[in-house]
Amino acid sequence: DVGEKISEFSSQLVELAQDQLESWDFDAPGVDVLEWAFNYLSENKLIDTKQTETGFPKNRLIDDGEGRKMVYLSGTTCKDVNLILRNGDIIAELREEVQFGEYDVTILGKSRKRNMSHDLLQYINSSILIVNNYEDQKFDKILLPLDYKDGMLKVAKYAVRVAIALNVGIDIFTVLEKNKSSNKGSAYFSKIVKFIRRSGVQYSHEEKEGNIVEQIIKKADENKIIVMKASDMSPIKRFLKGSIPLSVMNKCDVPILIVK
């Protein structure tokens, strides 16, 4: 709907009102979250101290025209730290951001909503690290559930990178269904173990019989990080049978890296 053109006097009033609003320094929705993130990074010395002297740089908040607002920072443990703000549905926006940035890993806090956890695993096209109750724990092992199926070598590579970063060992853990034989001597398993051994990371391997989810949860403790493969079932099968990574995530309170 287009109304009549306003008078010159009215136009001046509108401009005056806009100038007044700008002088009040209102923040766009969500900017306070970026400021909180900036303060957290600053307090933990994760960004260059030269960029923290004057506080959160609102004047450097950039709108890229793609529905994203950003602040570019220099990190201390990595080269770049970008604070990115999107508004909208969390699943849709995360999915778009992962596709836009081509991220390898998305790090998220554990959601209390089961449906949201399911959607995050299903629709975000990257590996996902779910951080549960993290408060500067000292992790002593990586728990690597191994099922002898294709795709486990990539999971092992992620496990090794995390183990090296934290200077810890890896517990390889295999759960066998009742009355099923082990594939421990298979060429594929040997390849995975050889890769881990050559990395210099200390490791052990244990096999147990029983329910996969129950055994993984029993094996995990508060000082371990689980690194496991994402479910390769179709969405319909996951809905009917349930996803092992999702079940472990919902019942465990340790960080879980789900590798896709």
Residue locations for each model-derived region?
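Charged docking surfaces used in two-component/phosphorelay signaling
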Residues: T52-R68, Y72, T76, V81-E93, ...
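Short glycine/serine/threonine/alanine-rich loop segments
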Residues: L46, S126, V168, V201, ...
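Gly/Ser-rich helix-loop-strand patches that form or flank binding pockets
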Residues: L83-Q137, A220-K260
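Short active-site-adjacent structural elements
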Residues: S181, E214-I216, S234-R238
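Aromatic/hydrophobic pocket-lining residues that form π-stacking "cages" and hydrophobic walls in ligand
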Residues: A37, L94, A159, I192, ...
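A structural preference for short, hydrophobic beta-strand core positions in alpha/beta folds
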Residues: K50-T52, N82-L85, I130, I172, ...
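N-terminal positively charged helical leader segments and presequences
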Residues: F26-K50, I62
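Small/aliphatic-rich secondary-structure junction motif
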Residues: D1-D27, T49, K141-E206, K219, ...
